[in-house]
C-alpha cells in the first residue's frame, strides 16, 4: 500500500474529491497526523477511552516541509455548570434534560515553538477545525469516518486574495438611521465607573444560550447528535476568539425547535430579531438564566444579511442576536456568531482607522467569506468602554467549584471540587502560591488567590477588600479566614441617596432626573408635576399599568408612578414608537408594548418616605420592610439590601464589636506614652542645668569698703551624670506640671482610611436601563 511505502508524516499533494472546495482555499493536501503519547502514562487504555479523559494532546505532522507539533488543551469551559438541552415531542410538550456529555473532545491550543499561533480543534472523529502558524491559517478535516491514529486528513491552506461582500451584517444602514457614528463611544448617561476593577485583568464569563429553529432541525436530518456536535464546535471557536479578550464563553443551554418554530421567522432580519427578543423575554428568561441568547436559523435572510443584533445590550433584556446558518463550513458561521455578539458589546464594524493584527478581524463586515481570528484595536476599545456600564456586572460571576459538573482536571485554569487553586500547566503557571502539579496551595501558605489574599497569606480581618463604589453600596471586609472577598452587598433598600432626591434600591439610586436623561439624553429635565396628572386619564399618553391591551389609569396618589414625563433633550430615539409632546411635557409611546419603555421605574421617590412599586406610590416600610432593621444588628453593623447585618467599615466580622482601629490605637498609646515621659524628664533636667549655669554667670565677687578688690579662686563644680534609671526617679518641680484636671485633651492621629466620615457623594447611580438601543 502507498501508505506503507511513505512516512506517515509526509504531506502529499493530492486532490481530495470528498471535500468541497471552499472560497479562499486554492488547494488542499493530505496529511497523516500522528498522536504523541505522553511518556509518564503507565495505564494501558484503548485510544478512544484514553483520549476521552486526556487533558492535553499533541499531534505531529509535516507542514511546508517542516515538522510541526500541534499542542491541544481540553476546553473545560465550553459547557457551563447546569448545562441543559430542550426539545419538543410530537405533541409540542417541552422536554428539558441535563445530559452527561460523553464526547468531551473539544480543544484549543497552538503550534509549539510558534510566536503567533492558535487552534480550535474537535477530536471527536479525527481532527476537525482550525489552526494558524504565523501568518498562515489552515483548516483540517478527516477523510475517513473511521477514527484511528495516523488516518488521512485534508489540510486546507487558506489564502484569501480579495474580499467578497456577498454576505454582510444587517447593522449597516441601521447605524446611520440612529445618528450614531462608527467606533465612537455612546454617551455615558447611565454609566457607573467601576473604579475598583481593572477590567482588562479580570476574567469575564458569558453564559451563552443557543436556539436552533425547526429549519435547522430538518436541515441536519432531524439528528440531534449531529446538531449538538456542530453547535459545540462553533461554540468552541467563539470561545477561542473571546479568550483573546480575557473572556470565557460557556454554553448554558441549547434548544431545538423540533416540532415547529415558536416565533414567526421571516427573511426580514429586523422582524425576526424583534420576535425572538420578545420570546426570550417572556419564555426563555423565565426558564433559564443566561447572559445572551442567539437564534440560529436555516431561513435565508433578505439581501446580503446573514446576522443582526441589538447594539450595546449585553446583560439587558435585549441581549439577543439572529444568525443565518449560511455556510457548510461551521467556522464561518461561528465567526458570524462572534460578530453579532460583538455588537451586543457595543462594537461597530471595523473601518480604515482600525488596526487588525491578522488578515481579518471579528468585526469586519464581510462575514461569510472570511473567518476571523482576532479583534481589532477599535473593537478592543469599544469592549473596554462597555465595562464602564454597571450592567456588565453580570459577566463577572464565575462558576463556583460546587457548580461545575464535569470531572475535575488540574491544569485547566478552573478551580473545581477538590482543588485549592488552578493556575494552568507548569509552563503557564505564574502563581507562586499554587502548586501547578497538584492544584493545591503550597506548604506554609494559606491562600493562592482572592482579594483577601496577600503574599500567599490571609489579610487581617476587617481590612477592606471591596470599597463602597457610591452611597448605595457597602464596603466588604476580609474575615481573616479566607482569601476571597465576601459577595457584593448594598445599602438597605430605602436608604436616602442623591441628597434626599432618591432612595437606594438594589445598589442603585433611581430618580426621575436620571431616567429622563437616560431616555432623552443630556440636557433633559423632569417635566412639571402638572404633566404627571395626565396619568389619571388612562390613555396611551398617560396611564399606570397595562393589563393585556387595557390601559389602567393612575389613582390620584399614584400619578408620579406612571408614564415618565420630561422636557428638553434629543428627539432621536433608537426605538420604534411615537414621541408625544404637549405644553412643556414630553413622553414616549413605544410600538413594542412588551417592554415598559418610558415608564417610571420601581424604587423612584414619589413623596416623603414614599417610592413607586408596581405603579403605586407606597410607604418605604411597606415596600421594603426595612425600617429600623439596623437597630437589630449587634455591634457596629448595618442592614444590607437583603436585611442581613453587615459590619461597618473598620469593624471586624462577624460580630462587628472589635476594631482594627482600636488595636492600632492601643499600640500608639503603649509606645508614645513612655517616650513622652522620658522626653519631659530629659527636657526638665536640661532646663535645670541651664538655669544653674546662668546663675553662676550672673554672680560677682564682693568687695569691702576702702579695700582693693582682689581675685577669688572659683571652686570647680562637679556635675553628676544622670543614668537612665536615675532619670526615671527624678521628681520635676511642681510648677512644671499642669494642674490635675486642667490638662489639654490628648490628641492622636486619626486613621482616615479606617474610619472615614459619612459622606454622601454627589454621584448618583442609575437604574439599569430596560431599553433596547438598537444600532
Swiss-Prot record:
Gene expressing this chain: ADAM28
Annotated Peptidase M12B domain residues: 204-399
Entry GO MF terms: immunoglobulin receptor binding; metal ion binding; metalloendopeptidase activity; metallopeptidase activity
Organism: Homo sapiens (Human)
Keyword vocabulary terms for this entry: Cell membrane, Cleavage on pair of basic residues, Disulfide bond, EGF-like domain, Glycoprotein, Hydrolase, Membrane, Metal-binding, Metalloprotease, Protease, Secreted, Signal, Transmembrane, Transmembrane helix, Zinc, Zymogen
Tissue expression remark: Expressed predominantly in secondary lymphoid tissues, such as lymph node, spleen, small intestine, stomach, colon, appendix and trachea. The lymphocyte population is responsible for expression of this protein in these tissues. Isoform 2 is expressed preferentially in spleen.
Limits of the Disintegrin domain: 407-493
Record carries keyword Metal-binding: yes
Record's comment describing the protein's domains: The conserved cysteine present in the cysteine-switch motif binds the catalytic zinc ion, thus inhibiting the enzyme. The dissociation of the cysteine from the zinc ion upon the activation-peptide release activates the enzyme.
Compositionally biased residues, Basic residues: 708-717
Lineage: Eukaryota, Metazoa, Chordata, Craniata, Vertebrata
Gene Ontology biological-process annotations: proteolysis; spermatogenesis
Gene3D superfamilies from the UniProt entry: 3.40.1620.60, Collagenase (Catalytic Domain) (3.40.390.10), Disintegrin domain (4.10.70.10)
Record domain EGF-like: where: 625-657
Extracellular side: 199-665
Name of this protein: Disintegrin and metalloproteinase domain-containing protein 28
